[in-house]
Regions:
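Short glycine/serine/threonine-rich phosphate/pyrophosphate-binding segments
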Residues: 12-17, 41-42, 63-72
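Glycine-rich phosphate/diphosphate-binding loop of Rossmann-like nucleotide-binding domains
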Residues: 1-37
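N-terminal beta-loop-helix "entrance" segment that forms/cooperates
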Residues: 30-52
């Protein structure tokens, strides 16, 4: 199982760091990525539609301010978000 931890910007990592620490503690492989629903929508679409093909089983998504990122990702993949 491989998890994608995605956030809207680098500054959101301060929010996601506890998630990453927990995944490390349980030795669950994951990748961290910045995928912005507002600044890089094409990247968001490509990431979401290809996440399963790229080996992800689950996507953890968060962004500061607005919660558009998780909803946008969930609308384009059948993986749990």
């Amino acid at each position: 199982m491989k998890i994608a931890v995605i956030m809207g910007s680098n500054s959101d990592y301060t929010t996601m760091i506890e998630t990453c620490k927990l995944l490390d503690e349980f030795e669950i492989p994951y990748d961290k990525k910045v995928v912005s629903a507002h600044r890089t929508p094409d990247l968001l679409v490509e990431f979401s539609k290809n996440a399963r093909r790229n080996g992800y089983s689950l996507i953890i998504a968060a962004a500061g301010g607005a919660a558009h990122l998780p909803g946008m990702v969930a609308s384009m993949t059948t993986l749990p978000v």
